[in-house]
């Protein structure tokens, strides 16, 4: 392991027009203008956004596999893997449940659907039929069985994050178990990390094009005008998500010695990319690299980030309970405390079953309402038109939640370089030396 003898000279910052976050901002603005004034042309820009997301998905599996395998194989005690995973899952379960409760509380306070007096029988259910059909496949057993791939190769071919995670953990444990015999393979995989992340950097140069196409399509197809009728619901959701991040996650960050706002600033390029593409997956490889650069252990990053993308969906959870109670209020459906507790419990399970599913938020909502028959599934037609505009906020909240979780779990494990984190969050990335991985078991575990 190379340890630098002196800090490198600070690199000259790039001009603003060459920085990714600025390019993405310009692309989003131009895409919105095109979609608004030339909606038919804007709709035709959809392939640009789809192509970029597919490019990123192409590299996600290798990034996850290499990060997890090299991280686990470098651990001297395999029980550390189980400890990190257990702490991560405990964090995910607590804050995912808290997000569901927050969405429910806000729905009661704001009452976004009150006074609409909608008759569910008069709603057009054909538009939501396909989502309801997909929701029938979301069962806990089916979700658990889907984690196991049919072959070692199929997980990479299908791009299933959980399956790649499963294979990587097993292979990393096996590689660590064989000791010195596995060293050549570990060295090869560690050498492979550099070109793979270089490829990520190359692909990210296309981010402005992808963001332009995705936002032009959204505005062109759905129009800003579709927000007016349900602006109270959309506004309530955005405000709730912001308060969840600023207050709840903000307190967690403060207790761990850093600011959630500085973390968001550090990840501004990734957040803008998520905003433009409405997909948190589009920034997954870059998030993993940046969290490691900010002082989080490679092994913790490799376990927490991919797992969090399936189990730590704070934004989706807020949306589910808020939208469900909005539908109940709009259709004058009375829900007892027992009904609402049942809704909460079902949402806890169904939100885990939609990992990696396109349109996961809407599909999990359909799955939840199907199990809690008191809320009419037909009421989903009310929010179908504005769901796309809430998708960006869901993705942004999910993304920030996973970034916070990575730092918190790293700190719990004593696997966080706080000096690197402070430099990164203060915007002094040019002063950062090459990352030196902190192996969790080398330090006393905390928490």
UniProtKB/Swiss-Prot annotation:
One of its GO terms (biological process) is L-aspartate transmembrane transport. InterPro entries: C4_dicarb_transport, Na-dicarboxylate_symporter, Na-dicarboxylate_symporter_CS, Na:dicarbo_symporter_sf. It is a multi-pass membrane protein. Keywords: Cell inner membrane, Cell membrane, Membrane, Symport, Transmembrane, Transmembrane helix, Transport. It is found in: Cell inner membrane. The chain crosses the membrane at residues 22-42, 52-72, 90-110, 159-179, 199-219, 232-252, 325-347, 366-386. PANTHER family: AEROBIC C4-DICARBOXYLATE TRANSPORT PROTEIN, PROTON/GLUTAMATE-ASPARTATE SYMPORTER. This is C4-dicarboxylate transport protein. It comes from Stenotrophomonas maltophilia (strain R551-3). The gene is dctA.
């Amino acid at each position: 392991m190379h340890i630098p003898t002196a800090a490198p000279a600070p690199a000259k910052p790039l001009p603003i027009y060459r920085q990714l976050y600025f390019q993405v901002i310009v692309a989003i603005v131009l895409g919105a203008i095109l979609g608004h004034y030339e909606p038919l042309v804007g709709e035709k820009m959809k392939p640009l956004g789809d192509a970029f997301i597919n490019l990123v998905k192409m590299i996600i599996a290798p990034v996850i596999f290499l990060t997890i395998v090299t991280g686990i194989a470098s651990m001297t005690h395999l029980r550390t893997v189980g400890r990190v995973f257990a702490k991560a899952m405990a964090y995910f379960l607590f804050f995912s449940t808290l997000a569901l409760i927050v969405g429910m509380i806000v729905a009661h306070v704001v009452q976004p659907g009150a006074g609409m007096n909608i008759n569910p029988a008069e709603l057009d259910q054909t538009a939501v039929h396909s989502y309801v059909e997909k929701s029938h496949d979301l069962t806990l057993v089916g979700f658990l069985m889907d984690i196991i791939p049919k072959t070692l190769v199929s997980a990479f071919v299908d791009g299933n994050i959980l399956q790649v995670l499963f294979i990587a953990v097993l292979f990393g444990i096996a590689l660590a178990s064989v000791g010195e015999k596995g060293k050549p393979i570990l060295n090869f995989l560690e050498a492979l990390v550099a070109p793979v992340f270089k490829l990520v950097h190359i692909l990210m140069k296309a981010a402005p094009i992808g963001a332009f196409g995705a936002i032009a399509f959204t505005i062109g197809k759905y129009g800003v005008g579709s927000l007016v009728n349900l602006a109270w619901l959309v506004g309530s959701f955005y405000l709730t998500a912001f308060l969840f991040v600023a207050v709840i996650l903000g307190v967690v960050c403060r207790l761990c010695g850093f600011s959630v706002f500085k973390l968001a600033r550090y990840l501004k390029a990734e957040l803008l990319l998520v905003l433009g593409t409405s997909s948190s997956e589009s920034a997954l490889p870059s998030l993993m690299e940046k969290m490691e650069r900010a002082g989080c252990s490679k092994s913790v990053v490799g376990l927490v980030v991919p797992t969090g993308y399936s189990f730590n969906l704070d934004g989706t959870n807020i949306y589910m309970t808020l939208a469900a109670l909005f539908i109940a209020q709009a259709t004058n459906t009375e829900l007892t405390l027992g009904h609402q507790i049942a809704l909460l419990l079902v949402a806890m399970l169904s939100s885990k079953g939609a990992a990696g599913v396109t349109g996961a938020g809407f599909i999990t909502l359909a799955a939840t309402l199907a199990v809690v028959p008191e809320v009419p599934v037909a009421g989903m037609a009310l929010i179908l038109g504005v769901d796309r505009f809430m998708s960006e906020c869901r993705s942004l909240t999910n993304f920030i939640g996973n970034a916070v979780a990575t730092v918190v779990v790293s700190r719990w494990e004593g696997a966080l370089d706080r000096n690197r984190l402070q430099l990164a969050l203060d915007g002094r990335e040019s002063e950062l030396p090459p990352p030196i991985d902190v192996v969790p078991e080398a330090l006393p575990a905390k928490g």
